[in-house]
């Protein structure tokens, strides 16, 4: 447990390091902390903080820098979120960009772009899981034994699937099949449709049964190229010296963007929590790079969490500025998707 003097000095050190990017010495701490302490007293407190693992001393400097553990204590107990940006202006920008009535995937992609533009780091969004409940389906004949299945979800998302059939179907037969499914099964999951079809198989002609079973099977298969993590503004991080000054670190960063596995895991974890979360590199096992942090928040559709969004940036980021950007964007994305 830190005493008030140590807390003030640690908070001042981290704020100055975030602002300047340079190790912070006792003279700077004396100037900005508001405490009337001698340089010797400040150095003693810094030594205590170093023993606690909250700050460290770079070999090339007499000053100190925060450790991941120090950042964690700072964001959990010392951070005052007073955004220097105009939150009303942010709200207007997000509302202008996230247009209700647009396809869901386009709205979600726009959110990633908004996060990137506002933070000047990288914006990331875990897209909503595909709905296995449908509002309407339609069959479109493409050629002999090839049919396009068009699925409209209750959220307004449109999904397409290819079906290879054992026989050719006339357009009138496809219309008959889609009308039957929409009339009897709309609003159900495809698993429930499969169960109902087994019960009603005697009432259907054999050709219609085969087509409907093919549609249900295709509907429950996720396409291989489905994007689950959308990233915008990766190039912004090339301007961040903390991440780009080391080639091996930069290569690892873009491997993270390319593979997306670790990001998917992190965003999935944060989707099970309420509100903004901060994952700090070197402190969280979910962040693969020590110099990287991720600020996330879940978003909802009609009160149900369906995904997560966030900002990826350096550990040395202005958290008090990024947190409200993420929070406002998540709230307005939730509102936009719920109005679809």
Curated annotation (Swiss-Prot):
Keywords: Repressor, Stress response, Transcription, Transcription regulation
InterPro entries: GAF-like_dom_sf, HrcA, HrcA_C, WH-like_DNA-bd_sf, WH_DNA-bd_sf, WHTH_HrcA_DNA-bd, WHTH_transcript_rep_HrcA_IDD
One example of a Gene Ontology biological process annotation: negative regulation of DNA-templated transcription
GO MF annotation: an example: DNA binding
Pfam families, A to Z: HrcA, HrcA_DNA-bdg
Alphabetized HAMAP family for the sequence: HrcA
Xref: PANTHER family: HEAT-INDUCIBLE TRANSCRIPTION REPRESSOR HRCA (PTHR34824:SF1)
Function of the protein: Negative regulator of class I heat shock genes (grpE-dnaK-dnaJ and groELS operons). Prevents heat-shock induction of these operons.
Family per record: Belongs to the HrcA family.
NCBIfam families per record: hrcA
Official protein name in the record: Heat-inducible transcription repressor HrcA
Annotated source species: Burkholderia mallei (strain ATCC 23344)
Source taxonomy: Bacteria, Pseudomonadati, Pseudomonadota, Betaproteobacteria, Burkholderiales
